[in-house]
């Protein structure tokens, strides 16, 4: 009993120490959150000087280095395409890689507005071509969302990575979903992986099928995209059948899509198609009719050649008619 009584004061002291540390941590967290809300309030009200003062006083961010809490004049000039103002600000020492609270750089803004001249000026001044926002968006992704091939080519020339980690937003998927087939063609020419699989989106081909972007689907298949790879166990043909797109269904089957493939629910494409629809009839017809020998030979030859070498088909010593057949022309 006496041992228990002697241990109580020490336990009480230990509790007080931990409680004090927790209280200080909570207070510090409260101050930071309050400052962030206050800075955001000033930004919304347009009082940039006050927001910059808060950032400089409490976070040590000086003017010209880019406050995380505000858009700099450099951001405004880039977003509005004011090239002369942009050059003037850069000559005055503004940081070309200044970031906002969301880690958006002036280059992000220039690409989002399709201002190629501004983007070139920023890149020549040393802008980070692969800068990532808190949402994982790159300047290349912004250029893609606008379908800007000029900005895209410029960024790629300066070393932009078309594909980063699998969890980040992909320019390829964005182009496929919005139907920017010229942009997609440009990315393919730079050697992207057309089968890049993002867990919550699937492959670019699957995304294009869900969005019913026929020209993008054609570009991806022509570049050698795997017609069976979709999202988890759902194939692109499942997506096309769900969207009731007869043109896309026929195209996928022509490129060798398996009409008997099953998803996680053990459903085939014909099972997910609308009842009595044209898509259902097409799938049932192909189910009852085997592919032609010519079709099977073409698929076999293309698989044997391999995706990295499909562009070399025109160099094969084959009749032009046969080359066109192998290239689906």
UniProtKB/Swiss-Prot annotation:
ANK repeats lie at residues 69-98, 102-131, 135-164, 167-196, 200-229, 232-261. It comes from the Eukaryota. The keyword Repeat applies. Pathway: Protein modification; protein ubiquitination. Pfam families: Ank_2 (PF12796), SOCS_box (PF07525). Gene3D superfamilies: Ankyrin repeat-containing domain, SOCS box. Residues 278-329 form the SOCS box domain. Keywords: ANK repeat, Repeat, Ubl conjugation pathway. The keyword Translocase does not apply. InterPro entries: Ankyrin-SOCS_box_domain, Ankyrin_rpt, Ankyrin_rpt-contain_sf, ASB5_SOCS, SOCS_box, SOCS_box-like_dom_sf. Induction: Up-regulated in growing collateral arteries. Expressed in endothelial and smooth muscle cells of collateral arteries as well as in satellite cells. GO terms for biological process: intracellular signal transduction; positive regulation of protein catabolic process; protein ubiquitination. May be a substrate-recognition component of a SCF-like ECS (Elongin-Cullin-SOCS-box protein) E3 ubiquitin-protein ligase complex which mediates the ubiquitination and subsequent proteasomal degradation of target proteins. May play a role in the initiation of arteriogenesis. The SOCS box domain mediates the interaction with the Elongin BC complex, an adapter module in different E3 ubiquitin-protein ligase complexes. Belongs to the ankyrin SOCS box (ASB) family. This is Ankyrin repeat and SOCS box protein 5. The lineage of its organism: Eukaryota, Metazoa, Chordata, Craniata, Vertebrata.
């Amino acid at each position: 009993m006496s041992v228990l009584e002697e241990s109580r004061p020490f336990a009480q002291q230990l509790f007080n120490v931990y409680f004090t540390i927790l209280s200080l941590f909570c207070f510090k967290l409260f101050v930071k959150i309050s400052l962030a809300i206050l800075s955001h309030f000033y930004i919304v009200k347009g009082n940039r000087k006050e927001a910059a003062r808060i950032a400089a006083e409490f976070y040590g961010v000086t003017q010209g280095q880019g406050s995380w809490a505000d858009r700099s004049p450099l951001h405004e000039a880039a977003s509005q395409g004011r090239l002369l103002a942009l050059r003037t600000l850069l000559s005055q020492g503004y940081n070309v890689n200044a970031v906002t609270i969301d880690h958006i750089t002036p280059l992000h803004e220039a690409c989002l507005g399709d201002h190629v001249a501004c983007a070139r000026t920023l890149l020549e001044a040393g802008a980070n071509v692969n800068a990532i926002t808190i949402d994982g968006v790159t300047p290349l992704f912004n250029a893609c969302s606008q379908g800007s091939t000029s900005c895209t080519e410029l960024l790629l020339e300066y070393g932009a990575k078309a594909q980063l980690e699998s969890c980040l937003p992909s320019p390829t998927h964005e182009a496929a979903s919005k139907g920017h087939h010229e942009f997609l063609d440009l990315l393919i020419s730079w050697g992207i992986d057309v089968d890049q699989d993002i867990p919550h989106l699937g492959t670019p081909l699957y995304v294009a099928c869900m969005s019913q972007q026929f020209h993008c689907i054609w570009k991806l298949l022509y570049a050698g995209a795997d017609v069976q790879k979709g999202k988890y166990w759902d194939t692109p043909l499942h997506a096309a059948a769900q969207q009731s797109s007869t043109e896309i269904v026929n195209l996928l089957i022509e490129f060798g899509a398996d009409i008997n493939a099953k998803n996680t629910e053990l459903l085939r494409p014909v099972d997910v198609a609308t009842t009595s629809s044209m898509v259902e009839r097409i799938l049932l017809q192909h189910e009852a009719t085997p592919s032609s020998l010519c079709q099977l030979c073409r698929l076999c030859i293309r698989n044997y050649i391999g995706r990295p070498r499909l562009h070399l088909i025109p160099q094969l010593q084959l009749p032009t008619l046969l080359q066109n057949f192998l290239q689906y022309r």
